[in-house]
Amino acid sequence: MEQEWLNVGKIVNTHGVRGEVRVVSKTDFPEERYKKGSVLYIFKQGQGEPLKVTVASHRQHKQFDLLTFEEISSLNEAELLKESILKVEKEHLGSLDEGEFYFHQIIGCEVYDEENQLVGQIKEILTPGANDVWVVGRKGKKDALIPYIPSVVKKIDISSKTIHIEVMEGLIDE
């Protein structure tokens, strides 16, 4: 079976002269994902096999996560990592509390209203602030934006990839 990967960040630049890299994070759990000793894989365009690295340090600076890796010790080595993607093996994801889900579990789910009519399929998740917003693609209609809040999202069944919502007035344009 082929290995499945999940994107957790992108190396956008170096920071300092000791091999530290600047990362735009794509994970909801940077403190877990980038903790010292965590194993990540660096995917560089045009490079066959990913480079396995171990996090040596992590700190936040402005809107970036700054990382060093045990295997990278100089600015010159870090320069080569620019524009690379950081990934983790899907099988090494941490467990979540009840009612919490990874984005990849939600994207692709079919959404049904209270009459069990198909609304559409979740194609993207936006994170604008207080709560996530699910972008639901609908056949022949504009995408619907569904807030992930208890008064709207009533039931999530990851095993069957279905989600049931209560459509509040004005939530979905016809």
Swiss-Prot record:
Keywords: Chaperone, Cytoplasm, Ribosome biogenesis, rRNA processing. It is found in: Cytoplasm. It comes from the Bacteria. Pfam families: PRC, RimM. Binds ribosomal protein uS19. Belongs to the RimM family. HAMAP family: Ribosome_mat_RimM (MF_00014). This is Ribosome maturation factor RimM. It comes from Bacillus pumilus (strain SAFR-032). The lineage of its organism: Bacteria, Bacillati, Bacillota, Bacilli, Bacillales.
